[in-house]
UniProtKB/Swiss-Prot annotation:
Keywords: Cytoplasm, Nucleus. Belongs to the thioredoxin family. GO terms for biological process: cellular oxidant detoxification. The active site is at C39. It is found in: Cytoplasm; Nucleus. Residues 37-124 form the Thioredoxin domain. This is Thioredoxin domain-containing protein C21C3.12c. GO terms for cellular component: cytosol; nucleus. GO terms for molecular function: peroxidase activity; protein-disulfide reductase [NAD(P)H] activity. Transmembrane segments: none annotated.
């Protein structure tokens, strides 16, 4: 289920409850001229993401847009610096264990297009 990002990503991740999983789809921003994400790999991954997350009430995902191409390409992009995102698309899996520790797993770039890797990553 697609959830709105109501606050900062840091706050959203801090509020992941124990034994809960939140997915974060790090995506290229939409190009105002084409009305599509500027990154072709993101455009290719979106149908897979949307199909999986829209068809499940158990899987929660928020979409985060990393910026236009020049913003993304800067080494100081906040998603590169704060969250260690190196490519788009990236699907982050954030799970808080019973002890309260937040575990992070990432499915990066072309791996997001591999249906087997994607299904295994989201546990469907």
């Amino acid at each position: 289920m697609l959830l709105p990002l109501k606050e900062s990503l840091e706050s959203t991740l801090a509020n992941v409850a124990k034994n809960e999983t939140l997915f974060v789809a790090y995506l290229a921003s939409v190009d105002p001229r084409t009305k599509q994400p500027w990154c072709p790999t993101v455009r290719a991954a979106l149908p897979l993401f949307n199909n999986a997350f829209n068809s499940s009430k158990k899987l929660n995902v928020v979409h985060v847009y990393v910026g236009n191409m020049p913003q993304w390409k800067t080494p100081h992009n906040e998603f590169r610096v704060k969250f260690g995102i190196s490519a788009v698309p990236t699907l982050g899996k954030y799970t808080r264990d019973a002890q309260g520790n937040l575990k992070t797993s990432l499915l990066v770039d072309y791996d997001c297009l591999d249906a087997n890797k994607f299904s295994k990553f989201i546990d469907i």
